[in-house]
């Protein structure tokens, strides 16, 4: 069933036959494959090295982290043991210092002993527990240290292996460069040989052309000499004409100036005659006009100066008005602030008075309680000898209550005085400010005018500098050399991969910082439980999920594209088979192929490629079906010939019908 004929076609593109051009062609064919293989090996080794390096760095970081955590736990356990020892010593010292003075204290002492024994037992249990924990932690630390040493040794081995492989790769690159240079030299020699063969024929043609060119050259030289002579004559004539044209232009300009001067003289004469008629005097001349003009110009300058002074005074008064308005607003704000402060102080005073009343009531209650306490003290004196301490405590308490009442009175007095002083100071400030405002404003106006002039000068200087720099910039832009631009794909896979790695690195750093802070919080708050996950770990997982979704989408697009290409090519293949062989193929499940004839589409053949069986409904149409099947398929094993004979018979039947 294989279509091995020379006239058959396939749906896939066949590779063209390579014409052997000797040793040179074979070298050209083999070297790119070797280069690609070596590059592929080099990339694989680099990737393996980076993966192993990252893995070992991660393991080292995890081991160091766990070692630090264990070390912290050890220190905490030791600190707790020290605290328990100190508390035990403190309790023992208290027990030794306290002696029983009556039967009740003896009972309490016995209770304390019982409690102390229970605490000692608890302490012993805790000590044993912490010792066992310390032993386990030491063992785990030693195991981690051994793992660290083994990991470092393995890392060194991997680094040595990678260095050796990198040296081998460098040597391979050198050999590749040498081979490429040899290939370039061979190509240059081949091109030179081909070029030399064509040069001999070109030299012959050029000798013939040179002879014809020499004859033409002589004729051209004679013509050139005559042309140069006439050119010189023409230039001399043109120079004379240009001189005449310049003189003619000067003459026209002089005539125009004379006409303008005449018109000006006529205007002056008219003006002088009009002036003489107005003044009724024959002595009026141009000198009189100049004197009048200068006097009017002086008057105009005086008026402009007066106007400038008026403008300046108006501007100064406007500035004064604005500043006074600002001062007024500030004073109003200060007034509001002081009023708010007074209200707040009154509230404070009211609260303090309430506190004073409460304290006085407390003092009265305490004074009422003093006689009852004195009776109690007398009873205690009969039983205990330490009555002097209680008396001193009562005296101190009385003194403190008296001091508190005195402080409350003093605070109220000071608040009242502050309110009064603030009111008087506000009035004094307003009076002082009102007297000195005009002087301060005049001084400030002069200073501001001087500053304004200096700033305007600086502004002009800077503007000139900016104009110069802008001119230089324009010159530089005009004379800017063309830069060499390196083309790069906008959406290249390398840029995408770098962007993804950079984003993953940033997310991992943030996650690492958050986890470290979380570990510190857990170590500080040992009793609290932390059931939350940091947001950065969720963000990193989300980013990885988005990347995986993007890759899935790309793979799905690629798969759908390949599926479309496959369907298109398979349809082309079926159409080609139908047009060339006269059969339409339909591939079914379980390795079955259904074959329809183009001459009788309702009849078919089913070939099972797994069981090597053949079924058909053509036996009702073709009379000698069994004989053809036995002859071609069973005896000779030629299924293509059997199908060809079927097509011939079906074609005859179609023509006969």
UniProtKB/Swiss-Prot annotation:
Keyword Nucleus: yes
Keyword field: Cell cycle, Cell division, Coiled coil, Mitosis, Nucleus
Main location (coarse class): nucleus
Ranges of Polar residues composition bias in the record: 96-105
Subcellular location: Nucleus
The keyword Nucleus belongs to this UniProt entry's keyword annotation: yes
CC annotations in GO: kinetochore; mitotic spindle; nuclear envelope
Regions of compositional bias (Basic and acidic residues) in chain numbering: 20-29
Signal peptide: none
Sequence segments annotated as region (Disordered): 1-29, 96-116
Gene Ontology BP terms: activation of mitotic cell cycle spindle assembly checkpoint; attachment of mitotic spindle microtubules to kinetochore; cell division; mitotic DNA integrity checkpoint signaling; mitotic spindle assembly checkpoint signaling; negative regulation of protein import into nucleus during spindle assembly checkpoint; nucleocytoplasmic transport
Coiled coil: 46-99, 136-533
Protein family according to the UniProt entry: Belongs to the MAD1 family.
Function: Central component of the spindle assembly checkpoint.
Name listed for the protein in its UniProt record: Spindle assembly checkpoint component MAD1
Provenance organism: Candida glabrata (strain ATCC 2001 / BCRC 20586 / JCM 3761 / NBRC 0622 / NRRL Y-65 / CBS 138)
